Swiss-Prot record:
GO terms for molecular function: hydroxybutyrate-dimer hydrolase activity. Belongs to the D-(-)-3-hydroxybutyrate oligomer hydrolase family. Its EC number is 3.1.1.22. This is D-(-)-3-hydroxybutyrate oligomer hydrolase.
Length: 699
């Protein structure tokens, strides 16, 4: 590991976290200087580490295709104090598996995986990729932003034909969050990959001990880390001590509790990741100008750069392309983007020639509504047979559904004299709010898995710039008793391996979402018979009544859907129940056509039987009904590459009508090309019509 000096801040012990370090000199400046100078936003040292492609590598951290596919996750020599290298290995393992179906029958090793080349053939063996990593913080000088930037340069990078692919983290994941979604394709293509964690980065602060994470996942106390922590709660030590006394075993999380509404900067930090990648490539391939320092070989626009990723990372790529004023980004390819669109009058989303009931709502709106209604809607007849995605006994879950329906009815929020009719009304309200009937079987697992409650709580905190001490709507993050769900001290602190195993949005890695009631904090599902309805209703009211500045902060994250005529592809699963296609991709495409008109180069591919979490596809009931959207994300990247490099036309917007695998839940037959029709140049009746602010998607 080589540490390249940047600004003045240093994380204690960071230079010792990886072995073999020496220091090189560098300075801040701009790309017009003769010397390749670090961008001014880079704070502290840049750490450069080479990987041989055998014992360790860029894509699999030395695990290879076999190791990533194994259910046995990599361990630590000393479980109480894992090394930075061990935490990196676990982070790559965990994040890779979190975004794709890792089962052979589901397509791993056949359609994707380290062994599969870009033509879809099994030719790459274990798929380890040698190369170099550059790691640093981006900050505004306060030491409180500390966005993690990471550039991977594969040994196959061709300086004469340079390319960059962005891989902004999805969700609130750490910096390796999109390694499977975009990083893998970029590395195989021989491109540098520009990662960033969006200012969330799985950063946590254990309030009771004061322990925080550093840039490489190793731990320090908040006082010793200072401004070099990934995240430290902003409250004074005395305030945190008082809070810990009243609410022990609690955790602050960066996305939820940084008070910075980080989403408003996701486009900007993605552009910074690209600029940092330019610096790294100039550092590695630029001419030596004074015997030690490198000059500039690549200037903005010189490198073919595809902004790519999925979910929040996909939204970040779109925002970056909109904000790009210097030519950093050449094209965009994103999957299931979580994007909040600033809709203008006259823009319309239609399906089958008829306007959809609702479109273009921001996440703060649809997520708080879904979190309120989903536990009840899950009991609707139309949701019968939904995959079960909860560790709770089915009887407990059924009771939650019945009680949530009853409480909603008592509050006048659903109608009906019995659970069945109340549940049908709850589901009808979700339909009226823009959720498609294609998502009916996913309403239950989105709530049962706690994906929707986690999103609702984290984003409500972020959009209201709340502190951990606020216990917004009486929710907080804590370790709990595995039997009762009551807040309890952990047997082993979850902080030890948080960087490697956490996802940045509790519940994760043993840190759970709890509701603070009269009897103390309890897992929100078990705190009251109706699964903490009061808290869910409070979250909904934040948006409905525009409380605590939520409207202003949501407006700050909205985008204009102006891609500045850059070629772009959006892929989205029609059945997505986490980021509904009406509110995200369809709305974005419609608004883009109003904004850019005929100059738009955006194609939209909507995948039937596609949903948000490919990692769920091995779960019984998911395997038989849904197909991998990731397969089409990779096809879209190939299409864009061919467009940029050989002028091949991008296929027009279309519905891709996939075929579910079928069979018995939990034992679906192997995925095959019969399930996955290609994206075509002439979609015929499957063409999506987009014109002058109106999108019409075939039924």
């Amino acid at each position: 590991m080589t540490a390249i000096r940047g600004g003045s801040r240093r994380a204690p012990g960071l230079a010792l976290a990886l072995l073999g370090g020496v220091l090189l000199g560098a300075c801040h400046g701009d790309e017009n200087a003769q010397v390749n100078a670090l961008p001014g936003f880079v704070s502290g040292s840049v750490r450069k580490t080479a990987y041989d492609g055998a014992s360790d590598d860029l894509l699999t951290a030395g695990l290879g295709k076999t190791g990533l596919g194994s259910d046995t996750r990599p361990g630590f020599a000393n479980p109480a104090q894992p090394s930075a290298a061990e935490l990196r290995r676990l982070a790559i393992y965990s994040n890779y598996r979190a975004l794709v179906d890792i089962t052979p029958n589901g397509g791993y090793g056949r359609f994707w995986g380290p062994n599969v080349d870009l033509a879809g053939n099994d030719t790459l063996g274990e798929g380890k990729i040698a190369g170099t990593e550059y790691l640093a913080y981006s900050d505004d000088g306060s030491g409180r932003k500390n966005v993690t930037l990471l550039v991977q340069v594969p040994a196959s990078f061709d300086p004469a034909n340079p390319c960059i692919v962005t891989a902004t983290a999805s969700g609130s994941r750490g910096v390796y969050g999109a390694i499977a979604a975009a990083g893998e394709w970029g590395l195989k293509r021989g491109c540098a990959v520009a990662y960033n964690d969006k200012g969330g980065g799985n950063g946590a602060h254990e309030i009771g001990t004061g322990v925080v994470t550093l840039i490489d996942g190793t731990l320090a106390t908040a006082s010793s880390a200072g401004s070099s922590s990934l995240f430290t709660a902003s409250e004074s030590s005395s305030t945190l001590a008082a809070f810990n006394s009243a609410f022990p075993n609690r955790y602050a999380y960066k996305h939820a509790h940084s008070q910075q509404n980080p989403e408003q900067d996701w486009g900007r930090v993605t552009l910074q990741a690209v600029e940092f990648a330019y610096w790294a490539l100039n550092e590695q391939f630029g001419p030596v100008v004074d015997g030690t320092r490198h000059g500039i070989r690549y200037r903005p626009g010189d490198i073919t750069t595809i902004a790519a990723s999925v979910s929040n990372g996909g939204g970040s790529a779109l925002a970056a392309a909109e904000q790009d004023t210097r030519g950093w980004i050449t094209a965009v390819v994103v999957g299931e983007p979580q994007i909040n669109v600033r809709m203008t009058p006259g823009v319309t989303v239609e399906q089958g020639g008829a306007p959809v009931p609702s479109f273009g709502r921001p996440l703060a709106d649809y997520a708080t509504l879904a979190n309120l209604l989903q536990p009840c809607a899950a009991a609707a007849v139309a949701a019968t047979g939904a995959p079960y995605l909860s560790a709770l006994p089915m009887g407990v879950t059924q009771s939650i559904r019945t009680q949530r329906c009853a409480t909603l009815a008592a509050a006048g929020l659903v109608s009906g004299a019995d659970t069945a009719s109340q549940a049908s009304d709850a589901l009808a309200q979700l339909h009226a709010a823009g959720y498609l009937a294609d998502s009916d079987l996913l309403q239950a697992p989105m709530w049962d898995s706690q994906a929707m409650p986690a999103i609702a709580v984290t984003y409500a905190n972020a959009y209201t710039r709340s502190r951990v001490t606020d216990n917004l709507c009486n929710f907080s993050f804590a370790t709990t008793n595995p039997v009762t769900g009551a807040v309890a001290a952990p047997a082993v602190s979850p902080m030890t391996n948080l960087f490697g195993a956490g996802n940045g949005v509790p519940p994760t890695n043993g840190i759970n979402l709890v509701f603070n009631g009269a009897s103390g904090g309890v897992d929100h599902r078990l705190a009251t018979p109706d699964a903490s309805f009061a808290g869910a209703f409070c979250l909904r009211q934040l948006w409905a009544a525009n409380q605590l500045g939520i409207g202003t902060n949501v407006d700050a994250v909205r985008v204009a859907a102006n891609l500045q005529h850059k070629p772009a592809i959006i892929v989205h699963g029609r059945s997505d129940a986490l980021v509904p296609v009406n509110h995200a991709s369809r709305a974005y495409v419609a608004q883009n056509s109003a904004t850019e008109g005929r100059a738009s180069q955006l194609s939209f591919y909507e995948v039937t039987n596609g949903q948000h979490f490919d990692a769920f596809l091995s779960v019984p009931g998911f395997d038989t009904r849904f197909v991998p959207v990731h397969y089409y994300d990779e096809q879209a990247l190939n299409l864009m590459w061919n467009h940029l490099k050989s002028g091949a036309p991008l296929p027009p917007s279309q519905v891709i009508r996939t075929v579910p695998r079928g069979g018995v839940p939990g034992a679906a037959p192997a995925l095959s090309t019969a399930n996955l029709p290609p994206i075509v140049q002439s979609p015929g009746a499957n063409a999506i019509a987009v014109n002058a602010g109106v999108i019409d998607v075939p039924l």
